């Protein structure tokens, strides 16, 4: 009896297993041919052409089913997607602002010093990084809708957002690595003291054309879209990726690495010669570090892509196992896990890519070259900055037009006039004449005044001499004339004393405003002021002569 009970129990268990397997097989058949798909897959009837469905953004889990993969891709958990999204929004925004600041500084809007091989490379490298970071700003604005227009459809080139971000990302990456190599070449040519002014515009045109060709040929082929394994709109076909990105990217990176070795060798030779040349060595450390930093990041991206391609078959097998798990365990599909790309490495690659904008600002935004550009720009050379900000030590601040200089000179002189008028009301006419001469830079008036003063003094001297000669013949008359002439001389002495007093007061005020006057007086104005000072000295000499007489 005991034996029969065990046998019955075994039969029941086997029967239950068979029933479950039968149900699972039926469910699997339903999934393959019916309108039901396990979570998170979604049912969609095929149109008959897999390529057409793929071009529309629909990716089926299996070739023999109507179940679509979810969007975003199941290779990342929801927590990992949120982590990547948050990192992209924060670092992408900061890097975008940093690259925008440096781009404006080196743009023709602010840079009035012209361009050379070095500044051209910085401007276009920054512009390329700016375009890459701009795709992050677009993503911040649209969110996951930019990647997934629908819950189970991936964005394609037909979607405007994908087209724009795809072009910006592809051109930005290609141009960035091209102009990075250009800066490496510039560093080497600078050390070798080789000039390339005649060919600068040509290599700029050639590099831009290369980047445009590698960007718009995939656009003509309608190759842009969001991959199941990606987080950006980029080239879909793996062959096109190699032709239009990875092959030129690797070649340019190889050329750049050779240039880096040559630069390090040249710097080593310079550092071994003399202490004077060590200053040259130190001046090239910052550009070299920038080139090395970007080289390391580009190299890491290349290594990550090589790792993905090397393990592509393994990752594809894991994806197939995940799909099988979903179909075979429909009631427990949430237990199925997909583990393909290493999330940590993906995070580091995306993070390093977004650090480039911050790095270009740190390495190129705080240099003597950038300081000179700012000091010669309208941002510094304006009345508001002169009035409310302290002038930088050792800086030579210039204005773009003489009119702006004269406005500031008149502003300073008018303030001095007000102070002089308040200190000396009794001599207001003389003070106004002097200030008007300085404000209007009227050299002719000063010369006329000097001539008139000299003429009056000479006349007075002659009259005094005549009176002295005739004093013995006509004492009453001579005394009267000497008294009159003496009054005239006293008046002239007092007038010139007042004139000297006002000149000294103006000089005292001019010393107080020395920072403003030194930074804005043009060469023409300096010459006029020197002539005015000579005239003032002549007036002082005439006054002293009059007193002696």
From Swiss-Prot:
A Gene Ontology cellular-component term: membrane
Leader sequence segment:
1-22
Q: Which PANTHER family match?
A: FRIZZLED_SMOOTHENED-LIKE SANS CRD PROTEIN A (PTHR31787:SF5), G-PROTEIN-COUPLED RECEPTOR GPCR FAMILY PROTEIN (PTHR31787)
UniProt record similarity statement: Belongs to the G-protein coupled receptor Fz/Smo family.
Q: What is this protein called?
A: Frizzled/smoothened-like sans CRD protein A
Q: Which residues cross the membrane?
A: 90-110, 120-140, 163-183, 199-219, 242-262, 288-308, 347-367
Disordered as annotated region, ranges: 417-483, 528-549
Extracellular face of the membrane: 23-89, 141-162, 220-241, 309-346
Record key words, sorted: Coiled coil, Glycoprotein, Membrane, Receptor, Signal, Transmembrane, Transmembrane helix
Spell out the coiled coil positions from the record: 432-475
Q: Where the protein is mainly located, per its record? A: membrane
UniProt-annotated glycosylation sites, renumbered to this chain: 63, 158
Q: How does it sit in the membrane?
A: Multi-pass membrane protein
The record's subcellular location field reads: Membrane
Kindly give the InterPro entries that the UniProt entry links to this protein. Answer: Frizzled/Smoothened_7TM, GPCR_2-like_7TM, GPCR_Fz/Smo-like
An MF annotation (GO) of this entry: transmembrane signaling receptor activity
Q: Which domain of life is it from?
A: Eukaryota
* BP GO terms, sorted: cell surface receptor signaling pathway
Q: Which residues lie on this side of the membrane: Cytoplasmic?
A: 111-119, 184-198, 263-287, 368-549
Composition bias type Low complexity, residue spans: 417-474, 536-549
Q: Does the keyword Acetylation apply?
A: no
